[in-house]
Amino acid sequence: MAPSQLPPIFNPTPQDIEMLLAAQCHLGSKNLQVHMEPYLWKTRPDGVNVINVGKTWEKILLAARIIAAIDNPADICVISARPYGQRAVLKFASHTGATAIAGRFTPGNFTNYITRSFKEPRLIVVTDPRTDAQAIKEASYVNIPVIALCDTDSPTDFVDVAIPTNNKGRHAIGLIWWLLAREVLRLRGTLANREVDWDVVVDLYFYRDPEAEENKEVAEEKVASAEDVGAGAIESGFAAESWDAQGAAAPAAFAAAGATSWEADGGDWAASSAPAPGGENWAEAQPAEGAKW
C-alpha cells in the first residue's frame, strides 16, 4: 500500500484494509486498460493484475466527498445492470436517499423527456462502465458527471472519477458500495464521528440468489426438529413413537387373529381325531381291481 496523501483523520483502519482484501477487491483481471495502469500495484505470475488498495480507498473518499456536496440526495442516480450490484445500489439508495436504477437501463432516461422514466440527475454512480455503457453515454450528452467502479480492463471513456476495484465479484461490489455509503453518512454528519461503527452490516449489500434462498427455506421446512421427533431419532434416524406404536399394536392384533382362528377350527380337529366307524383298518382294505402301484 502506497503512502497516503490524505489527512490522518481520513486514513483507513486496519479493519477496512482487511475487509478490502478479504472481499478480493484488489484482484483485477488479466487484461489491463492503459488508463487504469496508475492504479496497478503489480502483476502476479499467473497474469492477474493486482490493484493498489490504497488508491482504492483514496478514490472512495473522493467519490464520497462529491456525493456529500450535492444538496438534494435524490439528484444522485446509482445504477447497476450487473446482477451482483443491484441489491447494493438499492441498499445504498435507501441509506443515502439517492435514486436507484437496478436492472436494465431504459435508453432515453437522461435524454428523452417524453419517456415516463425521464430523469435529470446531477451525478450518476455506476457499478460497471462496460455493462452500464448506455447510462454513461447518455450522461455525456447532457453533461452529467460520472463515478464508476472500474476494474483493470474497464473502459474509462466519459468517466470522471474511477474507483479501482474488482467489479465482478459479489463480495467486492457489495463492500465498495457499503464503504461508499458509510463515508457519505460520515461526511454528512449522520454518523457522529469516525470512531463510531455503522450499525448496518456489510452482508446486507451482498448479492443473494433468490432461487437458492427459496430452496433453502423449503429444505428447512422439510427437516423435522428434535422437539418433534425426539433427540434419539436425530441420532438413529427413526422416531421412537413409531416403534412404540407398532410394538403395542402388533401383539394385540396377533392375539385377536389367533384366538378367532383356533376357536373356529376346534370342531374340525375333534371330528378328525374320532376313530373310523366299523373298525375298518386301512391295511386290511383290498385294493380295487385294476389298481396298479
UniProtKB/Swiss-Prot annotation:
Subcellular location: Cytoplasm
UniProt key word Hydrolase: no
GO aspect biological process, one term: cytoplasmic translation
Region of interest: Disordered: 265-293
Pfam families: 40S_SA_C, Ribosomal_S2
Annotated SUPFAM superfamilies: Ribosomal protein S2
Signal peptide: none
Name of the protein in its database record: Small ribosomal subunit protein uS2
